[in-house]
């Protein structure tokens, strides 16, 4: 997907005009209508951006399930997080370039994030935009960053990621180090040649993926408004603010976190903290068992709650910025954070007293956050009370079951020394 995005982006850049008066029409007319196959290249680039994030999210969650962030792959995981951050920056920079209504105002909101930094925030925002508002200097800078700087950085990070992968080897669904069991020639007993086994396997997966990919390219390039916002079919109007400003679908969960905390600085900290949690996974989960196959049932429940809460946040953010959606976003953010912060609980067997302490402390933290939100008049106390059951119920379910069924917190007693053919939850 990276190669496809670079190739299509190169052809789009040939015909694109980074000028506020020409940008929108260079996309709509020059690329979409006047250039041979320009519509196809543009649609492949738009759909490819979303497809890239789908693959990255699946790859990251697979790594979480099978413990690919644990020793000796901590550095490999951190490089992958940096790739994700660079990809997010690349997507944000490219979002402004069509100069549509949602592109303009979405970029205006994001560039204002840095103004939350005390003292130096406003000068940094002005330097980033090149002016007091988004205009020609901003568009030129974002175009150069999107076309040149970030692709080079992405390629460099991918290269370093592959070098690190070559040093430590890839993980597997069993979490077994195949290099610890070699034959007389030094070849891992469970190792197989890359060709034809991996090439045939990957060829099947790539073929199935491209069937879905090109269906969207030819039949639904806008993705029902998710891949390409409907407001971007109108040129940017700096005098008319849309009633609802939201990012593309792959950033919606983070937008819900940001929107759930009305204070700008704390909202940005909540948003940035989600990335920090991913980077801190090697420190939070220090259980020697890697794969989810051999972890406890409650650990599996917690790992399943991660993507579910992430998707729930995206669903909330897609709605209007009503007080109900803001409060729901706050509470689901608490669940998302909890799925990471309770990981140390599963590092070793816990006594009932320790489990009860974890439950009391976790519930206390949730209530302290809600009391603080009420104290700054962020949301009404009645609405907070009516919705506080969301994170409280999750924590009560997790630790309550640990108290009632201690066996559900224990990992498998037997760990294989060689690869097996079991399923995900084997």
Where are these regions (language model features)?
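Membrane-embedded and interfacial regions of multi-pass energy-transducing membrane proteins
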Residues: 1-51, 55-426
